[in-house]
Structures are given as structure tokens and as C-alpha cells.
A protein has these predicted regions:
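N-terminal leader/targeting and assembly helices and adjacent pre-domain segments
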Residues: 1-117, 121, 216-254
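Hydrophobic/aromatic-lined pockets within catalytic cores
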Residues: 26, 30-37, 49, 110-114, ...
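Acidic, glycine-rich two-metal-ion catalytic cores of nucleic acid-processing enzymes
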Residues: 128-228
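Short alpha-helical "recognition helix" segments of helix-turn-helix
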Residues: 122, 126
Length: 254
């Protein structure tokens, strides 16, 4: 009877410790989420302004004409930040990611403590999960940065009264099939829609845009491409689309 009571007390202590650990994990993941959201918002705001003014400068330099431009309105910046372009605001995605991570961490801790798993094995499993959490965080930030950069550039086209833009995909073998299809397609600025005809079209999207002022303006422009074998970059004509590049530099060379 005494041994059974001692075992019961030990089991009860283990459960109490487990619940405390699970609560600590949840609280810390949410604290991390708050930090990520606050830092990301500042980063995104700075990137919006930088993309807007840099693109205005590039447009004027390309045209060879300097003219006064308006400051980017605060309400436009807020609109870009608040836009649920992918169906869910980035802050909600951060909270979702940390919810998933917290649950996975709790499962590792629960199964480890209840089964008597070694601390080294548990530490390894926890490390793998936090590495994945870091990857998910980086993927979200990279994708959102692509969105706000391209959204800010659209605003710069409006400021310059440019009514069309051209979709620019990356010329290498990592480019997604959807971005390959959109490469060098021309769209109306007023109908730009992130995830549809404006990058990003998917997570880790590397596509961008440039002002479209007619085909003749592309004659003197070069595009960068990456050699599939060496990884080195080289220049191709600005009017060359992804399909043409693939046929000439991948299929024919292969």
C-alpha cells in the first residue's frame, strides 16, 4: 500500500510538473509572437517607404526627367499593412504559427516525460521543432516583404501616372511554374492584385515588377539569368521571356 501511495504521489508530481512546463511553453511562444509582430511591423513600414522612393528615383532616372513627387501618405502605408492579401493578415499567421509550434512542443514534452525518454533525445526533438519554427517565421517574413515591396512600387507607378506594369520572374530553374507563366505579362496598375497578377504568387516568391512604357523601352534593358550548371549570373535581352530563356539556355544546351 505504501509503495502504491508513493508511486501515486510521484505520478501526481510528474503531472504537475508537466502542466507547468506546458504553460511555460505556451506563454513563451506567445511572447515570441508579440516580439515578431512588433519588429515585423516596423520592418515592413520601413521597406514600404524605401521601395516607394527608390522606385520613384529609378523611374525618373530611366526617363531622364526629374520631377517633384508627393510623400507617401500614411493612410496608404496603413492600407498596405492591413491588407489581407493572402486571406489572413500576417499577425494572424504569426499567431497561428506559434500555436502550432506550442502544440508540437507540448506533445514532445508530454510523451517524453510520460515515457521516460532521455533528456538528450527530448532536447534533440525540441531543437528540430524550433528550427522548423524559425523556418516558418523566415518564410512568412520573406513572403510578406515581397508583398509590401511590390505594393509600394504599385503606388509609385500611380504617383508617376504610369498605367501599366510588367511582371518580372527570376530566370533560373527554381522559379515556380506559375511565375514562369506570368513572366513579361503586362497588367493594368489599377487592376494589380497581390497573389493574382502581382507578386508574391506563392511563399518564397522572388518575382517583381517594373514600369511598362512600351516594348521599345525594353530594347536597351538587360535581364539577369542564372546558369543552371555553374550557378553564375549572366545578362540576356530585356525582351526575352522565361519560356524563350528556358528553350535557348536550358533545353538547347542540354
Amino acid at each position: 500500500y505504501m509503495m502504491a501511495q508513493l508511486n501515486a504521489e510521484a505520478y501526481k508530481a510528474r503531472i504537475t510538473r508537466l502542466e507547468a512546463l506546458k504553460e511555460s511553453v505556451y506563454i513563451n511562444t506567445k511572447l515570441a509572437a508579440d516580439v515578431e509582430i512588433n519588429q515585423s511591423t516596423k520592418l515592413y513600414t520601413d521597406n514600404i517607404k524605401r521601395a516607394y522612393y527608390t522606385n520613384l528615383f529609378d523611374i525618373q532616372q530611366g526617363l531622364g526627367v526629374g520631377f517633384n513627387v508627393a510623400q507617401m501618405p500614411v493612410d496608404v502605408i496603413q492600407e498596405i499593412l492591413k491588407n489581407n492579401w493572402s486571406g489572413k493578415h500576417f499577425s494572424k499567421r504569426v499567431w497561428h504559427n506559434t500555436d502550432v509550434l506550442a502544440k508540437q512542443l507540448e506533445e514532445v514534452i508530454t510523451s517524453g516525460l510520460m515515457s521516460g525518454k532521455s533528456s538528450r533525445r527530448m532536447a534533440q526533438e525540441l531543437r528540430e521543432l524550433t528550427d522548423y519554427g524559425k523556418f516558418a517565421c523566415e518564410r512568412l517574413i520573406r513572403t510578406e516583404t515581397t508583398y509590401i515591396t511590390n505594393a509600394a512600387e504599385i503606388e509609385s507607378y500611380k504617383e508617376c501616372r504610369i498605367d501599366r506594369y510588367i511582371f518580372i520572374a527570376t530566370l533560373d530553374l527554381r522559379t515556380s511554374s506559375v511565375c514562369r507563366e506570368h513572366d513579361r505579362e503586362v497588367y493594368e496598375v489599377e487592376k494589380a492584385e497581390a497573389g493574382v497578377n502581382l507578386p508574391p504568387l506563392h511563399p518564397h516568391c522572388r518575382s517583381t515588377t517594373r514600369a511598362y512604357l512600351g516594348e521599345s523601352t525594353l530594347n536597351d534593358i538587360k535581364r539577369r539569368a542564372r546558369d543552371p550548371e555553374t550557378g553564375k549570373t549572366y545578362l540576356v535581352p530585356g525582351e526575352m521571356a522565361y519560356k524563350q530563356w528556358y528553350e535557348k539556355f536550358v533545353v538547347q544546351k542540354g
